[in-house]
Regions:
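Alpha-helical transmembrane segments of multi-pass membrane proteins
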Residues: 6, 10-18, 97-114
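Secretory targeting signals
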Residues: 27, 31-38, 42, 46-69, ...
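Short, charge-rich amphipathic segments
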Residues: 22-23, 82-92, 132-139, 220
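Hydrophobic alpha-helical transmembrane segments
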Residues: 1-62, 75, 79-80, 161, ...
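Helix-loop-helix units of permease transmembrane domains in multi-pass membrane transporters
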Residues: 77-106
Length: 222
């Protein structure tokens, strides 16, 4: 397990540093927007705008976790497929399914660390400015966007691991349709009642990569 995690870390470490800086940058800028409004018109105006106009001030973050998840999957798995490393990896004296699961687990762990850092930054700042009901409104609104980032990572990993180009296209279409679910309702907290199911739905997408590996092992290649 440690060896697999180390191998994945070597491949992705510079991208992860960039992803962390970019996501924190966007989260920090969103907090500065709140600070600017609060400084110019008072905290009461921030509360009024949030309640009366359904504004959450963090709309810039909407597609950032999605892009981070997509790019992580590409950085992690495209070299494996391009250099034919996956075939060698799957012939190591180690359970194949467990190896792929560990590679995906690595990606999930580093994404969760990155996204948790975003949440920590936003929470620490907003606790000093907004009432708990208001900053929890923002945090719950952005949660589906971060779940979309995790789902995007798992779905693009599935596409990258697929050994045939025809299935690449089909898997891409399916992935776009599945990811669309995370962005159907633009209103703040629109997904609150659905969040547990959305989290389960996100984790279940990990099983799709097993289908690609089964096809790879069966010799399905272009």
């Amino acid at each position: 397990m440690n060896a697999i995690f180390y191998k994945e870390w070597i491949k992705t470490r510079w991208y992860l540093l960039l992803a962390l800086l970019v996501t924190l940058g966007f989260a920090g800028y969103s907090m500065l927007r709140i600070n600017r409004v609060a400084s110019m018109k008072g905290v009461e105006h921030v509360w009024e705008v949030m309640l009366a106009r359904d504004t959450v001030f963090v709309d810039l973050l909407e597609f950032i976790p999605l892009l981070v998840g997509i790019l992580l999957a590409l950085v992690q798995f495209v070299p494996e497929m391009h250099h034919k490393c996956l075939k060698l990896t799957l012939h190591l004296p180690y359970p194949q399914l467990r190896m792929i699961n560990l590679m995906l687990l690595y990606g999930l762990v580093v994404l969760l660390i990155c996204f948790a850092a975003n949440y920590l930054l936003m929470t620490v700042y907003m606790q000093g400015v907004l009432a708990p009901e208001l900053y929890s409104r923002i945090l719950l609104t952005v949660l589906p966007w971060y779940l979309a980032g995790i789902a995007a990572y798992l779905l693009i990993s599935w596409i990258c691991l697929e050994p045939t180009w025809k299935r690449h296209v089909l898997n891409l279409v399916i992935s776009v349709l599945l990811l669309r679910i995370f962005f159907l309702a633009p209103a703040p907290e629109a997904y609150n009642a659905f969040l547990p199911w959305l989290a389960i739905y996100t984790l279940l997408t990990a099983s799709l990569s097993w289908l690609s590996i089964a096809r790879f092992k069966a010799g399905e290649q272009d």
